[in-house]
Amino acid sequence: MAAVNEWIHAEHAESYLGRADRIPHRTEGEATLLELLPPTTSRVLDLGSGDGRLLGFVLNKFPNAEAVALDFSPTMLEKLRQRFHGNSNVSVSDHNLDNPLPPLGEFDAVVSSFAIHHCTHERKRDLYEEIFRLLAPGGVFCNLEHVASATQKLHVDFLSSIGYTPETEDPSNKLLDLHIQLQWLRSIGYEDVDCFWKWRELALMAGRKPA
């Protein structure tokens, strides 16, 4: 997993953050994700939290919710702790998603933003199963994710739209077809599984644990 470990390096994380806020249409996906969260959400898990951007939006909507943020990049962990300094409802932990999730209790919502695509495909599926077990009945998993294009030309076009080339794209990316992942979620037991938003290689997939 050497490629994923690029995120250990501060320059890799800082380079991503310098571009992330300029990703086209990203806010549309984030807004749609927020609409899918249960109205009674009181406990949230954010996987691969980065600098806490998505979790910040979630907590703006649910200011009294308890949140657990997981990341393993030293740069991202520092930014997470800075962002949520003084908020006793937020717990920040060092955890690499390549490894099984620790025992964390139940959550009303599990969210992730552009993180799980760094895992191998086998690990992605295992992680979706682990998330299912962590969800409370009726809980929702929302994954705003980078997925594979249908053709290489579409992939190159997408990279160009966000300022990259095949030579400069993140070497840790392990992109997978969206529909394969939706089918995985259904086979695991999630209900109401769908792609709720998509722009090129950016997609929001979500499903609910039966109540």
Model-derived features: where do they sit?
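Conserved class I S-adenosyl-L-methionine
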Residues: M1-P38, R53
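A short glycine-rich, Lys/Arg-flanked "PGG" loop and its adjoining helix->strand segment in the class I
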Residues: R125-P137
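C-terminal alpha-helical "lid/dimerization" subdomain adjacent to the S-adenosyl-L-methionine
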Residues: C142-I188, V193-C195
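Conserved SAM-binding strand-loop segment of SAM-dependent methyltransferases
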Residues: G86-D98
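Conserved SAM/SAH-binding beta-strand->alpha-helix loop
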Residues: S73-T75
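Conserved SAM-binding loop
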Residues: L80-R81
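A short acidic, Gly/Pro-enriched loop at the edge of an enzyme's catalytic core
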Residues: P102-V110
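Conserved SAM-binding loop of SAM-dependent methyltransferases across substrates and taxa
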Residues: D51-F62
